[in-house]
Amino acid sequence: IPLGGEPIELLIAGNVVATAMTGGDGRAFLSYIPKAKGSLPFTVRVGTTSKVAMVEAAANLAVWERRTPIIAVEMASLMEAPTAQGPTVTLPGKDAEGRQPMPDAASGLGKLTQFYYNVLYVVTEDKVVGANDLVSAQARQWLSDHKFPVGHILVLSSDPAAFGAKLDELHAAGWKTLKIGVGRTKAFAEAFLQRRLDAVMVPEPAMGEAPRKAKVAKDWKDVRKKM
């Protein structure tokens, strides 16, 4: 908000858990200590006493222990292949223009994350959509619309080496339980295999497209059998 002195509210499960006022630069700092582990959806909105129009934004807060296993999932592996050139994820309010999820992807990933894995969704930046925060917001909305488990969304450049570099960065920061990735592209699988980690490709790629040590699942029902 480009105004100072405006009230901002942080909501968890529909309840206001923190408030703050914007400073001269239009920013506000909200403090909240989570009471449980996992991925926590939250909303930030302009307070009811504000002089500006009601605005709100949603995001997810990852409250993860370093010892809990993490699975990285390439967003493209959750979606049916496009029949024509179109957006990577569903545009808000335009479901017909978006990509549909692969059969059983939401339920299959839900079973993996229910008791064991935290999930890191990896999506490629889209210059047509715009800034990475917009790409992240669209990805979050698409995942929510199609009942996928809540997780952290990571937006990376289209450079094939981008995820490998991020994987090294995460491991160096102590997130060494990120040892497996489920993806659609060869570059994504190779980022794990080159580091002696596990990779599952879904759906089954064309002949010769799967790296030698990658596990291949014909669909999401088959993914759990490969892990």
What function would you assign to each model-found segment?
Residues 1-67:
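Beta-strand-enriched, solvent-exposed domains that form extended recognition/catalytic surfaces
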Residues 4, 78-80, 218-219, 225:
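General structural signal for secondary-structure boundaries
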Residues 131-227:
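C-terminal cap/substrate-recognition subdomain and adjoining C-terminal extension
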Residues 65-160:
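Conserved, compact domain cores that house catalytic/ligand-binding motifs in diverse enzymes
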Residues 39-42, 88-91, 170:
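A generic short-segment signal for beta-strand/edge and adjacent turn/coil regions
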Residues 42, 93-94, 201-202:
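Alpha-helix boundary/interfacial micro-motifs
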